[in-house]
Amino acid sequence: MTSTSQQFLAALTEYPDGALGPRELCVSCVKVLPVDRAALTIGGASTTWEPLSATDETAARIEAHQVVTGEGPAVDAAERGGPVLVDDLSLEFDRWPGFTTALGRDAYGAMFAFPLQIGAIAIGVLDLYRNEPVPIEPDELTAMLAVADIVTMVLMSRPPLADVDANAADSWWTPSPSSSEIHQATGMVVAQLSAPPRVAYLRLRAHAFAQDRPLTEVAREVIERRLRFDPDDDPLPELAN
């Protein structure tokens, strides 16, 4: 076990029984790694995405932009099954035009995305951020990979610590109110379009992207029957891939 892994495990033991959750995992990442913020998003290349937690509002906004645009380091990391390392987000417009445009003033610094997976089982992505556009060093990459492995094990309800309640992890998967709204709205759009859930989700996301609005707001309009999708309307091409 690397020294960084030991430091990370030690940071997790600082939390009392039952208090170790997604936010604590993110905060512990910042404590032991050379990064300024961290965030967790649950989902995969063929599923919907849900931000799970973040250390601050900036990280939370960036995660939300990835969910809405379907672009960004986390999306690519999930699709490739390997880390995506970005030294400077401000230079990545050609790579992720929708994502970087949506970022606006947040398009700065470095971002490193690590898929959370064990074998063929993938559950999400750990995103790590630096305020400055500083390239990652080999030893830093090794440390981040080690921490991502531990985060994966904890999120998969296999806590590596003897004093962590194994049942506590189960409650992390309870959808937040906003996530529940997105799921409910997706189901309603499935009925409206007579389409698979992923297509319905893409239509929701495309509408949010086109209007530069949070996905949760669009979902709420669908639930309240103030917005209905027409099968004859095509989603934005860049979001339909």
Each model region followed by its residue ranges:
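Intrinsically disordered, low-complexity terminal regulatory regions
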Residues: 1-68, 220-241
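Signal-transducing alpha-helical linker
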Residues: 4, 152-160, 177
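Regulatory sensory and allosteric helical modules in signal-transduction proteins
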Residues: 43, 59-95, 101-109
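Short hydrophobic beta-strand micro-motif common in sensory/regulatory domains
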Residues: 110-117
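Short beta-strand-to-loop transition segments that serve as allosteric relay/switch motifs
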Residues: 125-134, 139
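Allosteric cytosolic regulatory segments
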Residues: 141-152
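Signal-transducing coiled-coil/dimerization helices and immediately adjacent hinge/linker segments
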Residues: 160-241
